[in-house]
From Swiss-Prot:
Xref: InterPro entries: RING_finger_E3_ligase, Znf_RING, Znf_RING/FYVE/PHD
Region feature (Disordered): 1-24, 49-355, 417-497
PROSITE patterns named in the record: ZF_RING_2
Any Pfam family matching the protein: zf-RING_2
UniProt keyword terms in alphabetical order: Acetylation, Metal-binding, Nucleus, Phosphoprotein, Transcription, Transcription regulation, Transferase, Ubl conjugation pathway, Zinc, Zinc-finger
Self-association state and partner proteins as the record states: Interacts (via N-terminus) with TERF1. Interacts (via C-terminus) with ESR1. Interacts with LIM/homeobox factors such as LHX3. Interacts with LDB1, LDB2 and SIN3A. Interacts with LIMK1.
Disulfides per UniProt: none
Organism of derivation: Mus musculus
Name of the protein this chain belongs to: E3 ubiquitin-protein ligase RLIM
Length: 600
């Protein structure tokens, strides 16, 4: 009987995966058709504003909407959005936060972007109404070249604005299928807080498509395994943007980018619905761990009815990206280079305290190093009559654990340096961080002993949670730290000493690169790319294949010809040349070094 049930479940999953693949292939065909029909002016407009994204991620209607939106200019902010933004600044207690989340959670799929000084950001929240899957993506770009020109006073408002938009976008799509408003708003709040804590963490975990026609799918994703509906492009933003529903902002070269994806899946069973105030959120699993979210509930924690407590799983991923590189997720260049590289080498270790389980791993492929911190957070059931004291403590504990995870992640990155880390050393580091950052009680019942400092640095001062209002105030404001800074080659781990705040731009310094990275070659500028020859598909091009996307040229395709005579789809080679200065096939320089330096 059990075998038949498991077989049925497996067949359903396979069917869902096949449908998802077919849907993506249809969208990919629509993408190429859309690009083929664009005028050269419209193509440049969308390319320069990073609105094309990745083939298969967006529908043709969505791409057309982006084009129309960028032509018309950014829409004026509605009174409701203004009120939401104003209210978010004033939110300092749990009740008002829940009320605010309830008021915006059904607004719809949203995209937010902005720029101030040397920082630009974009955030997108999307929900699949069929599966209940929720994705939130947030990316920040810091232009190091202009870093010294931007004052701290300029950067702080940008940080605050980012947190407000972040909360709004993540909360709006949080729980459309939730059993009750309060049940849905609370996970939304948890999601929002997690997203705020994470600002810049890149994503990508390996999901391979069934056929090799377009390599855009073969990129790592920080998405949990599940049946998915394609989201808007989210990759590095504004340059790496395939799951973001992008709207604008060119990314300056020499920027450091990071990305964060939070994947939340509602799993509300019949008995759970009876427990009215359930945090209806159960994170899907991290593919790198291969552990289902249904197994993530702490064994030490049990509900009154003996059911597994719900959990939230956060996959925080960091990729070290050199300045000037235009990486669409894993990026075309990275995938091409990886063909001749050794397979992944991964170091992983776990720790668990008080029901909060963390898994850390580091992998390297094609010269790109990826750090992953997975946090599984158990959440207790609460009454849907409003926030109780227990709930406030639970949310405080959750925030604390998120910040702790960031501290551990940063320590892992910095202690790793450029050498192979020792698993035993890493484990000791985690244990030390765990002891410093507190042990959140299961479900957040008793968290007063937890320290909210997320820095594992021995010199960092622990941050005590003196009151729930302080923590809420910090989470609402998102973080008012100054602009990210470069401490040079030997930087200490980041310390979170702001009282109750989640410092967005302090996290950015994780990814500001060492001085020797400045010598790495950069891609071509848009002007240099536009100066290369471009032509339309001809009869002689039939049966020829673009070496970047592994797709045959078809009627209407636009091709770009490099000085070495090799040709590619214009949108494929333009993306490649944004991060490389050589031909993908023969590796000859597209421009002489003198010409490159004169423009770059």
């Amino acid at each position: 009987m059990e075998n038949s049930d498991s077989n049925d479940k497996g067949s359903d999953q396979s069917a869902a995966q096949r449908r998802s693949q077919m849907d993506r292939l249809d969208r990919e065909e629509a993408f190429y058709q859309f690009v083929n029909n664009l005028s050269e002016e419209d193509y440049r407009l969308m390319r320069d504003n990073n609105l094309l994204g990745t083939p298969g991620e967006s529908t043709e209607e969505e791409l057309l909407r982006r084009l129309q939106q960028i032509k018309e200019g950014p829409p004026p902010q509605s009174p409701d959005e203004n009120r939401a933004g104003e209210s978010s600044d004033d939110v300092t207690n749990s009740d008002s936060i829940i009320d605010w989340l309830n008021s915006v959670r059904q607004t719809g799929n949203t995209t937010r972007s902005g720029q101030r000084g040397n920082q630009s950001w974009r955030a997108v929240s999307r929900t699949n109404p069929n599966s209940g899957d929720f994705r939130f993506s947030l990316e920040i770009n810091v232009n190091r070249n202009n870093g010294s020109q931007t004052s701290e006073n300029e950067s702080e408002p940008s940080t605050r604005r980012l947190s407000v938009e972040n909360m709004e976008s993540s909360s709006q799509r949080q729980m459309e299928n939730s059993a009750s408003e309060s049940a849905s708003a609370r996970p939304s709040r948890a999601e929002r807080n997690s997203a705020e804590a994470v600002t810049e963490v890149p994503t990508t975990r390996a999901q391979r498509r069934a056929r090799s026609r377009s390599p855009e799918h073969r990129r790592t994703r920080a998405r949990a395994e599940r049946s998915r509906s394609p989201l808007q492009p989210t990759s590095e933003i504004p340059r790496r943007a395939p799951t973001l529903e992008q709207s604008s902002e060119n990314e300056p070269e020499g920027s450091s980018r990071t990305r964060h994806h939070v994947t939340l899946r509602q799993q509300i069973s019949g008995p759970e619905l009876l427990g009215r105030g359930l945090f209806a959120a159960s994170g899907s699993r991290n593919p790198s761990q291969g552990t289902s979210s249904s197994d993530t509930g702490s064994n030490s924690e049990s509900s009154g009815s003996g059911q597994r407590p719900p959990t939230i799983v956060l996959d925080l991923q960091v990729r070290r990206v050199r300045p000037g590189e235009y990486r669409q997720r894993d990026s075309i260049a990275s995938r091409t280079r990886s063909r001749s590289q050794a397979p992944n080498n991964t170091v992983t270790y776990e720790s668990e305290r008080g029901g909060f389980r963390r898994t850390f791993s580091r992998s390297e492929r094609a010269g790109v190093r990826t750090y992953v911190s997975t946090i599984r957070i158990p959440i207790r059931r609460i009454l849907n009559t409003g926030l109780s004291e227990t709930t406030s403590v639970a949310i405080q504990t959750m925030l604390r654990q998120i910040m702790t995870g960031f501290g551990e992640l940063s320590y892992f990155m910095y202690s790793d340096s450029d050498s192979e880390p020792s698993a035993s050393v890493s484990s000791r580091n985690v244990e030390r961080v765990e002891s410093r950052n507190g042990r959140g009680s299961s479900g957040g019942g008793n968290s007063s002993g937890s320290s909210s400092s997320s820095s594992p640095s021995p010199s960092s001062s622990g941050e005590s949670s003196e009151s729930s209002s302080e923590m809420f105030e910090g989470s609402s404001e998102g973080g008012s730290s100054g602009p990210s800074r470069r401490d040079g080659r030997h930087r200490a781990p980041v310390t979170f000493d702001e009282s109750g705040s989640l410092p967005f731009l302090s996290l950015a310094q994780f990814f500001l690169l060492n001085e020797d990275d400045e010598d790495q070659p950069r891609g071509l500028t848009k002007e240099q790319i536009d100066n290369l020859a471009m032509r339309s598909f001809g009869e002689n091009d039939a049966l020829k294949t673009c070496s970047v996307c592994i797709t045959e040229y078809t009627e209407g395709n636009k091709l770009r010809k490099l000085p070495c005579s090799h040709e590619y789809h214009v949108h494929c080679i333009d993306r490649w040349l944004s991060e490389n200065s050589t031909c993908p096939i023969c590796r000859r320089a597209v421009l002489s070094s003198g010409n490159r330096e004169s423009v770059v």
